Amino acid sequence: MPQTDKQVCIPPELPELLKQFTKDAIRTQPPDLIQWAAEYFGAMSRGEIPPVRERSEQIPLSNWAELTPELLKVLHSRVAGRLIIHADELAQMWKVLNLPTDLFNSVMNVGRFTEEIEWLKFLALACSSLGVTIAKTLKIVCEVLSSDHDGGPPRIPFSTFQFLYTYIAEVDGEISSSHVSRMLNYIEQEVIGPDGLIKVNDFTQNPRVRLE
């Protein structure tokens, strides 16, 4: 095989392009991610606007149920506390609730999930299709995960919140890890009480907590 001294140059803007691609994929929820990716990068190479679907265009088909926090809570209850769930089993649960197959496939593709799925990560990405911002997404996740039945504000263990916020921020790609660390340190030291729980209001109503 002939040798060559030619080097492959990676453009410095590639990491940002990939971060934006991930966000646009979550927003668009294409049924065929590979085909959509080809169209996406093809449009960018031609200097055209990539085929990103806006939230207002995401109208569910009449034969599918619309994804809601309530349905995600039902799904979470059926996962029954497991941290890992098999893809086929989760797909069947999703199908029983009559939720859109293309959305399931999109979450699977964006999360790069295989046969064994980390449930909290899947749930976080599913919630991100409903939440406009990271704070809104985390609010929905808290509502889904909260097991309080006394009518109080939704709350979850801070350790769970820490895991979810770190993961969602990583997928989003626009928030530095140092900012995430600062916010988590502040919340842990100044907000979290002896019970170790975080309430939705702790990160949506506190002016010193800016998750984005």
From Swiss-Prot:
Cell location: Cell projection, Cilium, Flagellum
One example of a Gene Ontology biological process annotation: sperm capacitation
Cross-referenced PANTHER family: ROPPORIN-1-LIKE PROTEIN (PTHR14952), ROPPORIN-1B (PTHR14952:SF12)
Taxonomic source organism: Mus musculus (Mouse)
InterPro entries: ROP_DD
Family that this chain belongs to: Belongs to the ropporin family.
Domain of life assignment: Eukaryota
Domain RIIa: 12-43
Summary of the tissues where the protein is detected: Testis-specific. Present in the most inner parts of seminiferous tubules (at protein level).
Disulfide bonds: none
GO CC annotations on file: cytoplasm; cytosol; sperm cytoplasmic droplet; sperm principal piece
Name assigned to this protein: Ropporin-1
Residue numbers carrying Phosphoserine: S56
Modifications made to the protein after synthesis: Sumoylated, sumoylation decreases upon spermatozoa capacitation conditions.
Primary location group: other
Subunit structure, as described in the record: Homodimer. Interacts with AKAP3. May interact with SPA17. Interacts with RHPN1. Interacts with FSCB; the interaction increases upon spermatozoa capacitation conditions. Interacts with CFAP61.
Record comment regarding domains: The RIIa domain mediates interaction with AKAP3.
Region (Interaction with RHPN1): 209-212
